Amino acid sequence: MKKVLIVDDSLFMRQSIKSTLMNSGKYIIVGEAATGDQGIELSLDLQPDIITMDNILPDMLGIDIIKELRKEEVMAKIIMVSAVGQESIIQECRASGADDYLVKPFSNESLIERIDKLALELN
């Protein structure tokens, strides 16, 4: 099973993603972070396979977290999960190292489909 870290300032969103992934029986949630600093620290400490990340956090933007993680050579697959759906933002996130981008709101099926795709790329 692949290890997943959830980075989102919304407790509801973290719980929703966690529940969806755990109920799939395919993923282990190794940690949750509500800020960018926590997300970076946990990514370095826990070495997750996949990171779900909100793009707008209280202390920094998800895109800046991605840049920091890639600079630190964290090779986890990163899926941005954000209410911001502007194509220019999506492209900027991908150019900075995001592997996928899912716009909120989304269905549980869409989340699992995207995470499954990233997990396959790890094999």
Predicted regions and their residues:
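Two-component/phosphorelay signaling modules centered on CheY-like receiver
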Residues: 11-31
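Acidic catalytic/metal-coordinating carboxylates
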Residues: 35-38, 61-64
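Active-site beta3 strand of CheY-like receiver
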Residues: 46-52, 57
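The feature encodes the CheY-like receiver
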Residues: 58, 86
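Short amphipathic alpha-helix used as the core "switch/output" element in two-component signaling
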Residues: 63-74
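C-terminal output helix
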Residues: 88, 106-115
